[in-house]
Amino acid sequence: MENRSVERVRENLKEIRFRVEEACVKCGRDPSQVTLMAVTKTVPAELVNAAVAEGVTLLGENRAQELLEKFDSYFLPPEQIHFIGHLQTNKVRQVIDKVGMIESVDSVRLAAEIERCAAARGRTMEVLVE
């Protein structure tokens, strides 16, 4: 991993945090109440972990295959990883143990499959419905 890439992650996070803080101040909101989610779309696990090392505590993955490929490399537990993209019903059982929330439930059929797979593992899955 190039040092320039890691430095760019640091600089980007610094800028994003500054912008979030500015926006919060403008609307009278406490910046500590805002959670930054780093979306990992096509970003190598090494750079994602550089963001985690800089204090990012929540990841968003939008592709099941990428999540499966990178999951074991992440420095965060499943509870701090959200699935944010369209999830195909046939991929639910592959990602159910790797995320703490599925933010993209767009059908009753998908919700039922999530419930079935989660129950089979003795857990519940938090979801957001589109």
Stretch-by-stretch model annotation:
Residues 1-130:
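Conserved alpha/beta-domain cores
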